[in-house]
Amino acid sequence: MNTTTSRWTSLTRVALAGVCVALAACSGPSRPKPTEIQGVPVLQDMRTSWTANVGKVDFPLVVSAREDRVALANSQGVVAVLDATTGKDVWRLKLDQAISAGVGSDGQQLAVVTRNNELVTLQDGKVQWRKSLPAQSFTAPLVAGARVFVLTADRSVIAFDGATGRQLWTQQRPGEPLVLKQAGVMLAVKNTLVVGLSGRLSGLDPNTGVIRWESAIATPRGTNDVERLVDLVAPFDRVGDVVCVRAFQAAVGCVNAELGKGVWTRPSAGEMGVSGNDTLLVAPLSNGVVQAFNRSNGERLWDTERLKYRILSAPLVTPRGVLVADNGGWLYLLSLADGALLNRIKLDSEELATAPVFAGGRYVVVTREGRVTGFQMP
């Protein structure tokens, strides 16, 4: 898969009726060839525990990791919950429609959005209810507080009753005429629904949809709609009340979601989301350079060019290091201290479909071909 092209063709224009029309691929200079990596020292063991298959994934998948289970889906409508310790199915169900966004879950109820703009909730391998949406969605629904929240491509946030599917409220914010066909940002912080709307994090009342606060991560600039695109992209990183995010090709930053105030922002030209811990935040750039920032103040801690010119996945910061994959099917482990390469393993010939997750004592990755791998780092 040509990832660079697919990311540009993933831009869609939202018409007034909420219909998205795909744009043609944008041309640009050819990407320099990455330097061959040879003689990687094994400074941290990475052991494969199990492999499984979910089927091809060509939508912005989000894997929901809860305790010892992971919930995931493929493009053709299969939704599955796996035991993260063994890779075995807890349950698996084939829907009658292809999937465009998911999986959202609170550990019990799951939610996905189909390409026919239908929100579908499931529990224990059975469909609970379905509701039509006014527009496409590329962001996994948020299941929280007995509600299901959806962020649609026309930048509307819609809340549904989790038990019945009854629509509770809708909130729409004006934005740029383009939207990414990429998972956005939506999470619950205490009694606030936090949503990425254009280049801002917005805090909404989950009961009414009223906006309580907004904090800018990036401001649209440029001479055309593509250059002005600064949507916030998944994955985000949360520690306590502070949520850190990336604005597409513009910046990274952190916001105190309890106070509704920005903590810091820094320029950062990347396309994928971020990951961090109590002290640092890791954010790959579009050119394959990986950067780490001080989480409290945004100061640059380190960057590494070891993976330069590779097309990288979103990262996962672990106690053992930073996991990040490239479009050639390699999974790398980088040092938390300085970004040095600690190990790499071959997963598949394809890129990852989403960022790695942790559940059941295993790190779980999913490739575009649908290969699911669980591994440990003893």
Where are these regions (language model features)?
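Bacterial N-terminal signal peptides that target proteins for export
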Residues: 2-16
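C-terminal motif of bacterial Sec signal peptides marking the signal peptidase cleavage site
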Residues: 22-25
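Extracytoplasmic beta-rich repeat domains
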Residues: 29-64, 91-107, 128-144, 167-190, ...
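Structural signature of WD-repeat beta-propellers
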Residues: 74, 114-115, 152-153, 196-198, ...
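WD40 beta-propeller blade core
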Residues: 80, 120-121, 158, 202, ...
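Short loop/turn segments that connect beta-strands within beta-propeller blades
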Residues: 83-86, 123-126, 161-164, 206-209, ...
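Loop/turn-rich, solvent-exposed surfaces of beta-rich toroidal or solenoidal domains
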Residues: 280, 284-292, 299-333
